[in-house]
């Protein structure tokens, strides 16, 4: 088994030649493009996908390899997941050659081999550079081709930085150097994810407003912080993909996701000092300005401002860059129960909302939209330990007030303000349960 650690970027077609020229200056070992043919397999009931597993056969110059990728972690475009590779003499699956640890119950399901069938394919040329960064070995792969499922297809034009040996920080360091040039967009959608989508008939991707965050029952505050930022980054990347594919309404959700990053930093600000995220927040400001301007989606998402901000957030998360800024007291707090933290801060944010909206504000409602947005975001991040139906019903009145203010509906404003202020809390006031 190998632990695959790689960072993926989508490359703007117009930037390919400039990118190739830059990669040739890095002083690494260059490999000419080779054609890679891949067939991905699945069962009719999506058993593999349901277990977060991906199965493929890759062909290269008459050689074949079967690969099984299993559940891992994706932070931004940084993929960290185990993979199992088996050499084959011909392009035919042989699941019995995979180790038993691959399978959920420690053994190959009896009927799986007879149920898997080709689902989609990728056909692309891979050009590689092997470079050394601070003693770590990194493979840079430029892939160009297409992914295809039945009558549907879409182009592949992406860059992958894979850590062959050494430290993940070296991958991030190299990535920072590369994104200083325009044309790269950190992407979380793998070739396989795009293939699965095409195989489903290429349905339109829908806008997904942020929902309540759920974390493990025994999570500590640091795990809550990580989960909140990962949610914000996932929302950012998902809606950026929609925006660049032509859904103009997704732009608002991209900006909302960046705001969620800021609101997360504020929520945990009593533990993580502002100086820990100064550089990150500066890059977010530059990114927001670029996105909010009148430039096209393509220009905005492939800009250096967006690429650097998203990469900085990924690096901040992966390296836990807040830790060097924590004193002994903060170290104790961040190791405490996230459930207790959530109860305390739910009460604080609810009290703030009531203090602001306890009385009609006349023409001053719009002035309070930023505060209302921040409080709603914070409650979305904190409410996951409670009945989701009850918590969402509580939130909907405040979300309704937000929408009414944003759209100038005076009657609706007062309706939702009264409803929101008169509802009972769904959490424990004491912070204990």
Curated annotation (Swiss-Prot):
Disruption phenotype: Cells lacking this gene do not show decrease of specific PPPase activity. The keyword Hydrolase applies. It catalyses: triphosphate + H2O = phosphate + diphosphate. GO terms for molecular function: inorganic triphosphate phosphatase activity; metal ion binding. PROSITE patterns: CHAD (PS51708), CYTH (PS51707). Keywords: Hydrolase. Gene3D superfamilies: Hypothetical Protein Pfu-838710-001 (2.40.320.10). SUPFAM superfamilies: CYTH-like phosphatases. Its EC number is 3.6.1.25. Optimum pH is 8.5. It holds the Pfam family CHAD. Involved in the hydrolysis of the beta-gamma-phosphoanhydride linkage of triphosphate-containing substrates (inorganic or nucleoside-linked). Catalyzes the hydrolysis of inorganic triphosphate (PPPi), which could be cytotoxic because of its high affinity for calcium ion, thereby interfering with calcium signaling. It also hydrolyzes slowly thiamine triphosphate (ThTP). YgiF is a specific PPPase, but it contributes only marginally to the total PPPase activity in E.coli, where the main enzyme responsible for hydrolysis of PPPi is inorganic pyrophosphatase (PPase). This is Inorganic triphosphatase. It comes from Escherichia coli (strain K12). The lineage of its organism: Bacteria, Pseudomonadati, Pseudomonadota, Gammaproteobacteria, Enterobacterales. The gene is ygiF.
């Amino acid at each position: 088994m190998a632990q695959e650690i790689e960072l993926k970027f989508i490359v703007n077609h117009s930037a390919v030649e400039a990118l190739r020229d830059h990669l040739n200056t890095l002083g690494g070992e260059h490999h000419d493009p080779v054609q890679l043919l891949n067939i991905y397999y699945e069962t009719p009931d999506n058993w593999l996908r349901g277990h977060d597993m991906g199965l493929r056969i890759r062909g290269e110059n008459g050689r074949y390899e079967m690969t099984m990728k299993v559940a891992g972690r994706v932070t931004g475009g940084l993929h960290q997941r185990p993979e199992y590779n088996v050499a084959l003499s011909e392009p035919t699956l042989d699941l019995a050659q995979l180790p038993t640890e691959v399978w959920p119950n420690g053994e190959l399901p009896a009927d799986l081999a007879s149920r898997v069938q080709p689902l989609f394919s990728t056909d692309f040329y891979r050009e590689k550079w092997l470079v050394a960064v601070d003693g770590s070995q990194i493979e840079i792969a430029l892939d160009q081709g297409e992914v295809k499922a039945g009558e549907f297809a879409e182009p592949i034009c992406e860059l992958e930085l894979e850590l062959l040996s050494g430290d993940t920080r070296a991958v991030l360091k190299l990535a920072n150097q590369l994104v200083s040039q325009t044309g790269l967009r950190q992407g979380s959608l793998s070739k396989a994810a795009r293939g699965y989508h095409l195989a489903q008939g290429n349905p339109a991707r829908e806008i997904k407003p942020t929902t309540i965050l759920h974390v493990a029952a025994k999570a500590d505050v640091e795990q809550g912080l990580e989960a909140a930022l990962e949610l914000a980054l996932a929302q950012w990347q998902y809606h950026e993909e929609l925006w660049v594919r032509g859904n103009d309404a997704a732009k608002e959700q991209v900006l909302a996701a960046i705001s969620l990053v800021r609101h997360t930093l504020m929520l945990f600000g009593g533990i993580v000092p502002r100086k820990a995220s100064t550089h990150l927040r500066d890059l977010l400001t530059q990114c927001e300005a670029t996105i909010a301007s009148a430039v096209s989606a393509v220009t905005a998402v492939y800009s250096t401002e967006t690429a650097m901000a998203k990469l900085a957030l990924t690096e901040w998360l992966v390296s836990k860059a807040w830790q060097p800024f924590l004193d002994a007291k903060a170290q104790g707090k961040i190791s405490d129960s996230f459930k207790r933290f959530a109860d305390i801060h739910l009460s604080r944010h609810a009290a703030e909302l009531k203090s602001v909206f306890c009385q009609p504000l006349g023409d001053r409602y719009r002035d309070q939209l930023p505060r209302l947005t921040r409080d709603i975001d914070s409650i979305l991040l904190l409410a996951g330990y409670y009945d989701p139906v009850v918590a969402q019903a509580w939130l909907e009145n405040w979300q309704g007030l937000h929408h009414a203010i944003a759209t100038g509906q005076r009657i609706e404003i007062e309706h939702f303000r009264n409803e929101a202020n008169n509802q009972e809390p769904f959490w424990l006031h004491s912070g204990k349960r």
